[in-house]
Amino acid sequence: MITNTEFDVPVDWLYKGKSRRKTNTKPSRPSTSPASSSSTSSSKNGDNSTSGNRSSNDKPRARSSSVSNAALCNTEKPDLKRNDGNTSASDTDNIPLLTPINSGNRSDSADIDNPATVDAIDLIDNDDNGSSTQFVRKKRSTSISNAVVSSKPRLASSAINATASSSVGKGKHPPISSPSNATLKRSNSTSGEKTKRSIFGSLFSKRSTSSSASTAKKPLPVVNTSTTENESGGIKAVATPDPRVKEISSPMRGVAPTASKPQTPILPSPALAVKDLSTVSLKRVSFAVDKFESDPPQQLPSRTPKKGNILIPDDMISEVPSISVGISSSNQSAKSTNSNIKGPLYTKKSKEYILALENQKLALREAAKHQQEAHFAANRIAFEVANFKTASDAGGKLTEKSSEGTITKQREEVSPPNVEADRELENNKLAENLSKAGIDKPIHMHEHYFKEPDQDKYQDGHSIENNEVTLDVIYTRCCHLREILPIPSTLRQVKDKTAPLQILKFLNPKPTLIDILSFCDFITIAPIHTIVFDNVALNQDMFRIIISALVNSTVLDKLSLRNVRIDQDGWKLLCKFLLLNKSLNKLDISQTKIKSDLAESLYRHNMDWNLFTDVLSQRSHKPIEELLFNGIQFSKIPYSCFARLLTSFATQKNFPESGIRLGLAGATTSNISQDCLKFIFNWMSQYNVQGVDLAFNDLSTMIKPMVGKLSALSYDNLRYFILNSTNISTSYDLALLLKYLSKLPNLIFLDLSNLSQCFPDILPYMYKYLPRFPNLKRIHLDSNNLTLKELAVVCNILIKCKSLSHVSMTNQNVENFYLMNGTDSPVQQTNTDGDLDSSSTLDVKGQFAKNSFSSTLYAFARDSPNLIGLDFDYDLISEEIQSRIALCLMRNMKRTMDSTFQLDELDSQDDLLFDGSLVTMTAESVLEKLNLLSDKSTKVKKDTTKRYLLKKYIEKFHILHHNVQHTIDTMFEKRKSGELPLQEKENLVRLLLLEQNLCNILELFSHNPNLNDVLGSSRDDSKESVDSSEDSKLPALKHVESGYHVPEEKIQPENDVITARPHLMATDSGKTIDVFTGKPLVFKHTSSSTSVGCKKQEEEEGELHKWGFFVQQQRSLYPENESTRQTPFASGDTPINTETAGKSTSSPSVSTSNNETATTSLFSPANPKILPKIPSGAVLRSAIMKAKGIDSIDDLIQNVNSNNIELENIYGESIQNSASTFTPGVDSDVSAPNTDKGSVETLPAVSTDDPNCEVKVTATYDKLLNNLSMERSIRL
């Protein structure tokens, strides 16, 4: 089975980004709620006090009133250098920007700096007594409360004093001037300031502030419950002291022995952490698909209910009647708003209300009385029915026994037990009958009286055999069972689809609980491979319902929870889900969008990553192949935790053979540090890693480590390398990466998008290194602000990469497509005179750029054999080019699927015609642009891009001209043998017209003096073009300097026939001449190097050459016509098919085989006759002019063609003698169209009496081809 991965590279796991990110501005961190921001600022202040206070206690008090980012940067760098000399400057520069510090880190960092508190931290892991853990529990809970709520300052101070006293009690040195003492006093002062503000706020604006801070206080119960458990306290320590632990652990992770102390409270016991998940329950009741075959009957409530006529007394005195709640009608809502403004119509003391209340009480008493009477009547009827049933059963048995007449005394004595046995048997039979009985379904029978019974049986049998229900029916029933209508966004995705479903997205961003319940009922029973909940606002109950619905799925492959809010309890549910689910292999828990009111505890980097790591290592089912952590700031978690996470991911049980993929793309800031990046490259080299998504991370300062790892380590398994929006500053840095990436053997995808600062300077390096990639299949160059001229250069580069199957060049700058800015626009503006309109110049340039790029893009799609995907802004090119590109991609797909696929001749001819029309359309713009150039345009002459593109265009033009000539000659050979169908004859006419147009354009190019000025010397161009692979397809040229010359050893020896002919060509001095056509090519050395005599000689030889070629053509025509007039057909002979008409009119000067055919057709092989020598020179020319009364050879040729003047009048008996030696069996119907009456008689198939129209059309095409072939012979 052929999968999609065999044709293209899947990139659905890569992060595309929200929008184009500006590389200059990178926010340090996302904004938070006011409560969290205030706590962050206070925590930063606290950190300054702990890091900068070594000498005295007055400095932190003086600095506590001001919170400045500049102070943070200035005070923290020297402190880090004092603490550890191994800390680099780059690490310290990034710490204040990448890692926000909270108050929880403040206390822990102070404890780390203080040796007394370091021993207190050791008590967390070593001691299991209640005393030590109580101190830690109090200290951490109060630090968190100080950061978030800051409402218990005295509790914090007492906890800190308790910690200090415990350290002194253990025999440690008293904290006389230690930073911990300063920290204790500082935390009291900070909390005291907040207490003062809260006192004044309670008098004035406490109620207003409490409502705004309510959202920040909601996470408190989650934090407190997590700290009550013994292990969870250690787990919470992972989330809070991230920056300080990173500062100490990251420089010492090599051999430093003291790194184990701060890492001890961060990494809890893996067995205990996973054991805690046993209390998490994921049980859920689901529907059975095979039990509800029909839609359950129900009464769905209307969306616009009507107001009733009955009004109870309570509704009379209420503001909004309860019967009106939920009515969504506009009119009724308007009435209700008006009634709310006026208030209730009645009061409790009103007469109407009292009367209605008394009537209601009376009605209730009457209802109770009737209800009691009905109850008694029902009981009486039930009692009578029961007695009647027993009596009837007994009477029936007695009558049966009396009728038989076999009652004896023995049976009468034992009759009571027999009666009981009979009753049991009857009861059993009744139970069996009742078990078989059921409700008649369907309730509503739709009878069709005009159907045949056999048809109904067939349909019923077919429905029983194929009882598979579509997914939209199942989803509708699930919603009906919840008494809601189906959600349209979900119903459209499952409409008329059967199981299994490939992907299902929940597209409601703010769902209700009933929506989640109905959706989860569906995904529980329907097999779905990929389920997406991206950007859905879920609470804790909804998240639990979703996880419980998917935990037992055996088909689920991928679960996407991007930007879904997950708290600590939800994280445990997710870990339990990963531990129990047996089919999941792709998980997306990215957090790329962070709301401003999101609490700090709900950030992904504050989750329990140690628990997640342990679950990955202990998961024994299908391994995880793809983990996407995009947007998660791993720079804020400890380095050891990050390394352990990646290692457990790469060392799973049942590791996949295809490899693993990891997503670490940044969203708002850069997520990885330099140490993490080095570990990632070592990790990719050590394990079977397909790729790591590093997009949207700032890698501008990490090029040297990346290049060093790529050059030193082997990456045989690496298949993806993503540099999208990585802020690489210079093209040289990107060129270094391309140099070493080109050596990777299995790299199939390269992403160079959003690197506009490196373009177009990187294009020469791309030209050098991209063809060296051994297996590159897909490349992305999106959003690089490339102009059409630069895109054309990219296409010419990518055409050399034959293994490419997909190219993306979307989202380029639209303004540059018209070349309104850049280097081209000033050239035209400065060089324009008063007579030249600048607007028209810009239009010409824009159209030229569009036409040139369209042809280049089409050539790229046509000449790339494996290209099946080309992403581009197709609105910028014409619809005809779009359709042609799509056709080329479809052909490449067929060629990829079927190795024996070949284009037929009609398709190849059609492609050649389209290429010719496209090149000629571009040639007009090229000529106009060349005419606008002047000698002062030095910028254009020095523009290497323009020279390169123009040279490629000229090469493409000559290749096309040669292909057209070769195709015409091949088709004439088929026409000579009678194998050319009618449709190919039509294409042959078009190709002849195209060839004539191409020759005219080449003639115009050859006389344009500005062309050589732009291209430079032809010798330089020849050195580059000789090495190209297309040289074998080009025609042979006389001069080596042309750059298109084929070596002489490759030319066949049949060219001797060509050189033996007279009047074959007239060589122009100083020009590059085609041996076959005799026409000068574009490149010429000098335009005025010949003298007047030489020009006169060239003119004379050119006229004689033209007349000699015409005479040669007429000689091949007249003997055949003469033979047809003299020799009639025999009785047994049949006339030759008209498709062979004019077969000798094909150009005898294109290939050697045609030359041999033309030569053998002139003479009879039995009686060869040498033609008399034709006079030449000025004598012949003057004699012809004088005798015939003409001014030029063109007039003489016109007299022969138009005025029916035969060659016998010019050459006498020589032509008639040659006619007698010619054999009559060779194409007697080939003639000039208007020579004489005999030529018309040579087309016997064309007659007005023949009703077949195809024969007439064929004859018409033959005449037209004869004319065109004659003109082509004269022109050549």
From Swiss-Prot:
An example Gene Ontology biological process: chromosome segregation
Location(s), subcellular: Cytoplasm; Endoplasmic reticulum
Region (Disordered): 1-239, 394-417, 1016-1036, 1119-1167, 1221-1247
Post-translational modification Phosphothreonine, affected residues: T99, T264
Biased composition (Low complexity): 27-53, 156-167, 205-218, 1144-1153
Molecular-function GO terms, alphabetical: protein phosphatase 1 binding; protein phosphatase regulator activity
InterPro entries: LRR_dom_sf
UniProt biased composition (Polar residues): 63-72, 178-192, 1124-1143, 1154-1164
Modified residues (Phosphoserine): S68, S103, S143, S260, S269
Record keywords, A-Z: Cytoplasm, Endoplasmic reticulum, Phosphoprotein
Record field: compositional bias (Basic and acidic residues): 398-417, 1018-1036
Coiled-coil residues: none
GO cellular component: cytoplasm; endoplasmic reticulum; mitochondrion
SUPFAM superfamilies: RNI-like
UniProt miscellaneous comment: Present with 656 molecules/cell in log phase SD medium.
Family named by the database record: Belongs to the GIP3/HER1 family.
Subunit structure and binding partners: Interacts with phosphatase 1 (GLC7).
Protein's name according to its UniProt entry: GLC7-interacting protein 3
Organism, as annotated: Saccharomyces cerevisiae (strain ATCC 204508 / S288c)
Gene: GIP3
